[in-house]
UniProtKB/Swiss-Prot annotation:
HAMAP family: ScpA. Belongs to the ScpA family. GO terms for cellular component: cytoplasm. Participates in chromosomal partition during cell division. May act via the formation of a condensin-like complex containing Smc and ScpB that pull DNA away from mid-cell into both cell halves. The keyword Cytoplasm applies. Keywords: Cell cycle, Cell division, Chromosome partition, Cytoplasm. It is found in: Cytoplasm. NCBIfam families: PRK00104.1-2 (NF000993). This is Segregation and condensation protein A.
Length: 234
């Protein structure tokens, strides 16, 4: 099965998405948490063998520098550190304004296209909605946090032998069988039983496919929070 994940328009688009989840002013977000979310996302893409563009990696190195300085004991005020953070937040704010204008122009484009018979050029800004307000990217960002924790656990297990022959179809059947018995399960609980990262990835992709097909239903009560699967819609 090919993995096709809607990407962001660039590193600032990803950062804006993460910042917007906190529902506060850009300058009031917990910057270290945002940086950790970004780094988890990039690491998960790498584990899943998805291509990561160079500008994402460059931003990751800059964010790691900000994070490391944030976590150092503050014996002396680091003016350079504050400048790095301020510069980053200003770039996110500027990108937010740019994206708002771009979306407004896209809407106007859609309206004008109704008056012409030729097909309009499609403009895409967001990834597909799976169920209600949950998108593929919402679930993937939550999944990237789980993957970060699972990687840490598996690093201490030197007896695990990786295998790459997990079939998405088999995982889908396994999830459906489990829901027949339990009605409600969390992905975290399933992942705890996994022995390899390949198994974790296969289960996540199987879950996405089941959600897309409306075979199972998904709940997430907080941003980046636990992913709950249900047999029936509430």
């Amino acid at each position: 099965m090919d993995i096709k994940l809607k990407d962001f328009e660039g590193p600032l688009d990803l950062l804006l998405h993460l910042v917007s989840q906190y529902k506060v002013d850009i300058y009031e977000v917990p910057i270290v948490e945002v940086i950790e979310q970004y780094l988890n996302y990039i690491e998960t893409l790498q584990v899943m063998k998805l291509e990561v563009a160079g500008d994402y990696m460059l931003m990751a190195s800059q964010l790691m520098l900000i994070k490391s300085r944030r976590l150092l004991p503050k014996v002396v005020e680091h003016i350079e550190e504050e400048d790095l953070e301020q510069d980053l937040l200003e770039k996110i704010e500027e990108y937010s304004r740019f994206k708002t204008v771009s979306q407004a122009l896209a809407k106007q484009h859609d309206q004008r296209a109704k008056w012409y018979s030729k097909p309009k050029q499609e403009l895409i800004f967001e990834d597909a909605i799976l169920q209600e307000d949950k998108t593929v990217m919402d679930l993937f960002l939550a999944f990237s946090n789980i993957m970060a924790a699972k990687r840490a656990v598996l690093k201490n297990n030197h007896t695990v032998i990786e295998r790459d022959d997990y079939k998405i179809e088999d995982m889908m059947a396994s999830i459906k069988q489990r829901l027949e018995k339990e009605n409600v399960i969390s992905l975290s609980a399933i992942f705890e039983e996994c022995q390899t990262l390949n198994e974790v990835i296969s289960i996540f992709l199987a879950s996405l496919e089941l959600i897309k097909l409306h075979v199972v239903f998904v709940e997430q009560f907080s941003n980046f929070g636990a992913i709950i699967l249900r047999k029936e819609k509430k």
